[in-house]
Amino acid sequence: MVGSIGSLVLDVTIAPEGQLRLDDDRDASIRIGGGGQAANFCAWSAALGEGARLVTRVGRDELGERLIAEIEAGGVEVRAVRSPEPTGAIAVLLGPGGERTFARQERAVFGLRPEDVEEEWFRGLTLLHVPAYSLFVEPLASTARKAVEVARAGGALISVDLSSAAGIREYGGARLALELALLRPELVFASEAEAEELGAPLEGMAKVPVVKLGTRGVRVYGRRVPASRVETVDATGAGDAFAAAFCSAYLDGATPLEAAGRAVLVGAFAVSRMGARP
């Protein structure tokens, strides 16, 4: 059983046909579905055959219940605390090459407190995946630290995804590097931009440092594993798919390079379609 702590939100993904301009009116492909980095990781893990548990916080609203039912139907166990704030939502605007711009509202999950969660939710895990988004804002950050402590005491590996170059820039690269030094994750996933914003060698942050290179593949221990050649439709959730596949393979006994080879295939599938989930 793998687990993650963080967001379960509604993704509204918009792919305009052509360049948007102010006061313009364009046709677009629009997809509405579940998202959130922690939720996506769990959804992809379940699709790959892993038991998966998501710990999150949603509003006391119809949207929250619908998102929980949707991800549970995909095989994910959900431990959700209810919040007076509305369930989170993210608008994703896609560019012509699959690049993304986000507008987000996630106050519900950011308010998840240590006293809201039960330690039992983090026991019995083989791996706990922590998006850096879950470390950027209190009280969620303190809750994530508690989760790491409990999961590790039960024998779980810890993986961290650095989540966002802009988020690291706002939070502070040196501050996040210190956080990683204290958390001591076994695995760290980062894009090139995220690794640069961190400002510290990723190799010193974890036993297995993984740098995602986009269309050029992935780098592990300085060795590059090439990406599969596919047309990028929507990269939303592709990093979560990659991390889920890497962790699944690694837990099954694959070497880091073997795990990366499997993960790039799943990541390629993820970018070839709209939406963040399998």
Q: Where are the predicted features?
A:
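Glycine-rich phosphate/adenosyl-contacting loop at the front of the ribokinase-like
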Residues: 1-55, 62-69, 73, 90, ...
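Ribokinase/PfkB-type carbohydrate-kinase core domain
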Residues: 1-9, 70-82, 95-223
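Conserved phosphate-binding/catalytic region of the ribokinase-like
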Residues: 26-27, 149-150, 200-278
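Short, conserved glycine- and acidic-residue-centered signature motifs
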Residues: 34-38, 140, 239
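Glycine-rich phosphate-binding loop at the start of an alpha helix
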Residues: 35-40, 145, 257, 261
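Short, conserved phosphate/pyrophosphate- and ester-handling motifs at nucleotide-, phospho-/glycolipid
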Residues: 45, 191, 239
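Short acidic/glycine-enriched loop/turn segments that link adjacent beta-strands
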Residues: 85-88
